[in-house]
Amino acid sequence: IGAAHSFVHQYRFAVPETVDKAFVPRAMSYILLLGIVSALLASNSANFFKDLTDTQFTGSFLFLSITALIPILFLFFYTDEKINIEKSKFEFNRINSILKNPKIILSIVCGGVGYYVMASIMTASSLFLHIFKEFTIFETSIVIQLHIIGMFLPSLFTGDLIKKFGHNIIIVTGVLLLFSSIFINIFFQTYLGYAIGLILLGVGWNFLFLCSSALLVVS
């Protein structure tokens, strides 16, 4: 499941190869927007299949493993573009000069930090809410669903915001949203507080992740 998840995130870099640079942010937004399906499917399936076997949650992981295989069916119909080998070697040899580009450094740092903060809080939240705060699996799954919706629903307009305000403004906004999420989760430890905090966490991640990805491509 982890390996499949890591590869799925690379799909957003395949899209810019087939569209104009001006359309890159919006095209990548469409890819991330499909993640909204996971908010409706994954959380409910985890609760539905958790008692499928004697060991709790084994059924949930089996179901997710099956869903991870679905993209293979679509990839059979994907035709890769021909790559100029000489050009690829030339670009690879210039990797050091490429990394001197401040925009590329900014995109790597923002994407990495944004994902680290989001993944750390999201992963800990599900355990914290269910085990320490003693919310039910259903209540916990609702909070996680809201978080995932916050992660992907903004993709409807994030691409347009990037085109209108630029990469830097959206990156700063994403950072402020992450700080707001941390503040709310620390000082408003109620069910509603956790829900709002995780929604802001998702939106902040979306701004940082999508903006850094688009910035990396156009740089």
Mark where each language-model region is:
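Short amphipathic helix-loop junctions that connect adjacent transmembrane helices
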Residues: 123-143
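Structural signature of the two symmetry-related core transmembrane helices
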Residues: 169-184
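Helix-loop junctions at membrane interfaces in 12-TM secondary transporters
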Residues: 1, 186-198
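Helix-to-loop junctions at the C-terminal end of transmembrane segments
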Residues: 50, 153-167
